[in-house]
Amino acid sequence: MQQSPHSPQSQSLSASAVDSAVPLSKLQQTYAVIPRERPQTPLLDSVDSPADLKTFSSAELITLADELRLFVLYSAGQSGGHFGANLGVIELTIALHYLLDTPQDQIVWDVGHQAYAHKVLTGRRDQLGTIRSKTGLTAFPERAESVYDTFGVGHSSTSISAGLGMSLALRYQGRAQTVACIIGDGAMTGGMAFEAMNDAVQQDADLMVILNDNDMSISCSIGGFSRHLAMLWESGYQVDISDAGEPILCQRPDMQAFDRRKRHKEQRDVPQLEDNLFKAIGFTYFGPFDGHNIPELLRVLSLAKQVKGPVLVHIYTTKGKGFAPAELDPVGYHAISSLPAEDNAPKTEKAAIKPSLKYSQVFGQFLCDKAAQDKKLLAITPAMEEGSGMIEFARQFPERFFDVAIAEQHAVTLAGGMATQGVKPIVAIYSTFLQRGYDQLIHDVALQNLDVMFAIDRAGLVGEDGATHAGVFDFAFLRCVPNMLIAAPKDENECYHLLNTCYEYQGCTAVRYPRGVGTGATIIQPAQIYNIGEAVIESVLGTDDAPKKLALLAFGTMVETAQKAAEMIAKSPLLASSCQLHVVNMRWVKPLDTNLLETLVEQGVTHIATLEEHMIMGGAGSAVNEYLLNESAAFKIHRPTICNIGIPDRFVAHGSQAEQLADCGLDVEGVFNQLQNLLS
């Protein structure tokens, strides 16, 4: 890395002047509760930009870390959001913004759910409590939000590719600026990260990669790469560069503080220096180091910054650092909800209300039930065991559970390979992440018509995580694939039985369901097999002699909204007597119930409206249009007016799911207004 002309090396805390003897144990604090009132943070309050850090002493930087950690704790309690990962990079964030000349020097965060401290230090301190709210800060770095957010992120394993692109473009333009990519050990399991590292060596790019190794993604990191990192840790510090002619050798922190690593110790002998993967592919390697030791971080990062060519700094951190409950339960504290308001009113006994199941819980229940009946069932997830509702399945059937880490492409083709051997693989995957395995879905599964089922979670709008995590493209990119069946359940009960229906089908299928809880529907046993491509008329409102007849074709979660909007129309003084409404639960996106469509048109419907929590362009409504315009015999004789209701041609900003639906006109009132305009 070339030295920036604005580097702080001449300031009060140069790399050579760092006092590594500062008593960290006396300055670093651990908290047991999330504060409800804004804490006193005098040092942090003086930081309005990274430039304000440059005059801080070593002790002040460590105290700042304590204040920043407490402030992030408080803010997360106010707004909810990603939690453990942010607490684990407080010291690293301070060190980077102290050492680098941001925003001229570029910091790229992988995934971005660990960037809260970065937002605070770059002028957004007083807005942090608004994070993930509709008018507040975004959950992840976003270029439109700040000049310090150099690359928009949200998905995993992209930082090294993006950072390499920046570095090469800067080199081409003759600009000497440092690019630093921060990537976690979980994200490093993604193949894209290795593709980028391979190219960084090929290009001999000046690129700093900081591997934040906390042995976790959302849950514990797994696989051969995780074991390799553990072996590097067990081997002690390994550094390739000399400081004033002497090798840098730093005392390793107390292993008791990192006892999660111990489970790897017996898996293989301690590696030799030549076993280092990063060195083997051509990176200069520093580490591993204690990622919570600011003086040590500054010294190592300062030296790494001077290296020409690609360099990797390996640090070890604790997810949830400084908050005792999160250190003990890093999975449970990956993200939190906002603290409930304090209620000092007298408590009264209330009737117990049975909470609705989450759709991921419905999937988990189906998975366990079916696995107990069919030994051919195998389940795959790309690092989403908890989120996809698979914990109990993994406990009951560990030999049939495959967590492949953050490797969506591999997950899909792995399932294809399994299917060739007479088993039934189920790939549990979020809609937004299935996009990453699209080529494999087409080429390695659908083209061969292999017996693979996709359980697609987080479909539709997902709320506070915003556009990066929205699952609003899957109807479009799946329904154009031959051999593909696509089901969209209206509630928990239908989800369970559609999962069973698709499981029993021989071929490539997908069941698409949303984030969060269902409608409260009871799952009726035993499991049923629905007729493929058959819709259900939920209700008929109005009389047969009404001059206007509307067929409201709803897909998935929009069935309940359609029913409520139809009931509003039926009660409307202007429309009640003049309109008959058929509310249809389409249930299947592919194949459509074309027999029902023909019947509705033949019976003289005057208007057809489709309703989906998906992009209008290319979605289920488009499938209805295509059939009616290109194949329907009845439509050639009688042409009702068609309206497609869904998500418009734009990315939907973060906010609650209810706010997002209202913003798109997909809440009950919004749908009612659109139907009213259609019928007027």
UniProtKB/Swiss-Prot annotation:
What residue range is the signal peptide?
Answer: none
- Residues bound to Mg(2+): 185, 214
Query: What binding details are noted for the cofactor?
Result: Binds 1 Mg(2+) ion per subunit.
Please give one Gene Ontology molecular function term for this protein: magnesium ion binding
Residues the entry annotates as binding thiamine diphosphate: 113, 154-156, 186-187, 214, 323, 408
Residue stretches of biased makeup (Low complexity): 1-17
Q: Does the keyword Coiled coil apply?
A: no
Give the reaction(s) catalysed: D-glyceraldehyde 3-phosphate + pyruvate + H(+) = 1-deoxy-D-xylulose 5-phosphate + CO2
Query: Needs which cofactor?
Result: Mg(2+); thiamine diphosphate
UniProt pathway annotation: Metabolic intermediate biosynthesis; 1-deoxy-D-xylulose 5-phosphate biosynthesis; 1-deoxy-D-xylulose 5-phosphate from D-glyceraldehyde 3-phosphate and pyruvate: step 1/1
Q: Name one GO biological process term.
A: 1-deoxy-D-xylulose 5-phosphate biosynthetic process
Sorted alphabetically, the keyword list is: Isoprene biosynthesis, Magnesium, Metal-binding, Thiamine biosynthesis, Thiamine pyrophosphate, Transferase
What PROSITE patterns does the database record attribute to this sequence? TRANSKETOLASE_2
Q: Relate the protein's function as given in its record.
A: Catalyzes the acyloin condensation reaction between C atoms 2 and 3 of pyruvate and glyceraldehyde 3-phosphate to yield 1-deoxy-D-xylulose-5-phosphate (DXP).
List the HAMAP family: DXP_synth (MF_00315)
How this chain assembles, per its entry, is:
Homodimer.
Family listed: Belongs to the transketolase family. DXPS subfamily.
UniProt name for this protein: 1-deoxy-D-xylulose-5-phosphate synthase
Organism expressing this protein natively: Psychrobacter cryohalolentis (strain ATCC BAA-1226 / DSM 17306 / VKM B-2378 / K5)
Gene assigned in the entry: dxs
